[in-house]
Amino acid sequence: CSAVAVRTLRPLSLSARAACSSEDKITVHFINRDGDKLTAKGKPGDSLLDVVVENNLDIDGFGACEGTLACSTCHLIFEDHIFEKLDAITDEEMDMLDLAYGLTETSRLGCQICLKKSMDNMTVRVPEAVADARQSVDLSKNS
């Protein structure tokens, strides 16, 4: 009898979880290299790289290393008021950002920024071009 009860409750709990998660979604606006606005949603705790990948956003070359801090292709530029609220940058992220194209004072790597509810409806800008830090490393190994 208890096995039957578990089977009938399981779908209810899954649908309840789905309803909660859709309400908890955070909207992020990306301005791509062409100046087009791409809007996507993610869950609290998702990285901005996760949001781009899971929503199949068309941002060429974004996240080439899949979030392993081995490139700078997920480089994003934040508005000042959002940048000031981001968690502290690590030395590893700073090293990768040093190799990023179009570095600004409000640049961060999308793979290192996790969504919080306070970020709902934020807009981030993708730089005009991308530099893949892995290629720079590969080139220096060959010389």
Curated annotation (Swiss-Prot):
<keyword id="KW-0153">Cholesterol metabolism</keyword>
<dbReference type="GO" id="GO:0009055">
    <property type="term" value="F:electron transfer activity"/>
</dbReference>
<keyword id="KW-0408">Iron</keyword>
<dbReference type="Pfam" id="PF00111">
    <property type="entry name" value="Fer2"/>
</dbReference>
<keyword id="KW-0443">Lipid metabolism</keyword>
<dbReference type="InterPro" id="IPR018298">
    <property type="entry name" value="Adrenodoxin_Fe-S_BS"/>
</dbReference>
<keyword id="KW-0809">Transit peptide</keyword>
<dbReference type="InterPro" id="IPR001041">
    <property type="entry name" value="2Fe-2S_ferredoxin-type"/>
</dbReference>
<dbReference type="InterPro" id="IPR001055">
    <property type="entry name" value="Adrenodoxin-like"/>
</dbReference>
<comment type="similarity">
    <text>Belongs to the adrenodoxin/putidaredoxin family.</text>
</comment>
<keyword id="KW-0479">Metal-binding</keyword>
<dbReference type="GO" id="GO:0046872">
    <property type="term" value="F:metal ion binding"/>
</dbReference>
<dbReference type="InterPro" id="IPR012675">
    <property type="entry name" value="Beta-grasp_dom_sf"/>
</dbReference>
<keyword id="KW-0753">Steroid metabolism</keyword>
<keyword id="KW-0755">Steroidogenesis</keyword>
<dbReference type="GO" id="GO:0008203">
    <property type="term" value="P:cholesterol metabolic process"/>
</dbReference>
<keyword id="KW-0001">2Fe-2S</keyword>
<protein>
    <recommendedName>
        <fullName>Adrenodoxin, mitochondrial</fullName>
    </recommendedName>
</protein>
<dbReference type="GO" id="GO:0005739">
    <property type="term" value="C:mitochondrion"/>
</dbReference>
<feature type="binding site">
    <location>
        <position position="111"/>
    </location>
    <ligand>
        <name>[2Fe-2S] cluster</name>
    </ligand>
</feature>
<keyword id="KW-0249">Electron transport</keyword>
<dbReference type="GO" id="GO:0005759">
    <property type="term" value="C:mitochondrial matrix"/>
</dbReference>
<feature type="binding site">
    <location>
        <position position="71"/>
    </location>
    <ligand>
        <name>[2Fe-2S] cluster</name>
    </ligand>
</feature>
<feature type="binding site">
    <location>
        <position position="65"/>
    </location>
    <ligand>
        <name>[2Fe-2S] cluster</name>
    </ligand>
</feature>
<dbReference type="InterPro" id="IPR036010">
    <property type="entry name" value="2Fe-2S_ferredoxin-like_sf"/>
</dbReference>
<keyword id="KW-0813">Transport</keyword>
<keyword id="KW-0411">Iron-sulfur</keyword>
<comment type="function">
    <text>Essential for the synthesis of various steroid hormones. Participates in the reduction of mitochondrial cytochrome P450 for steroidogenesis. Transfers electrons from adrenodoxin reductase to CYP11A1, a cytochrome P450 that catalyzes cholesterol side-chain cleavage. Does not form a ternary complex with adrenodoxin reductase and CYP11A1 but shuttles between the two enzymes to transfer electrons.</text>
</comment>
<dbReference type="GO" id="GO:0140647">
    <property type="term" value="P:P450-containing electron transport chain"/>
</dbReference>
<keyword id="KW-1207">Sterol metabolism</keyword>
<keyword id="KW-0496">Mitochondrion</keyword>
<feature type="binding site">
    <location>
        <position position="74"/>
    </location>
    <ligand>
        <name>[2Fe-2S] cluster</name>
    </ligand>
</feature>
<feature type="transit peptide" description="Mitochondrion">
    <location>
        <begin position="1"/>
        <end position="19"/>
    </location>
</feature>
<dbReference type="GO" id="GO:0051537">
    <property type="term" value="F:2 iron, 2 sulfur cluster binding"/>
</dbReference>
<dbReference type="GO" id="GO:0022900">
    <property type="term" value="P:electron transport chain"/>
</dbReference>
<feature type="domain" description="2Fe-2S ferredoxin-type">
    <location>
        <begin position="26"/>
        <end position="130"/>
    </location>
</feature>
<dbReference type="GO" id="GO:0006694">
    <property type="term" value="P:steroid biosynthetic process"/>
</dbReference>
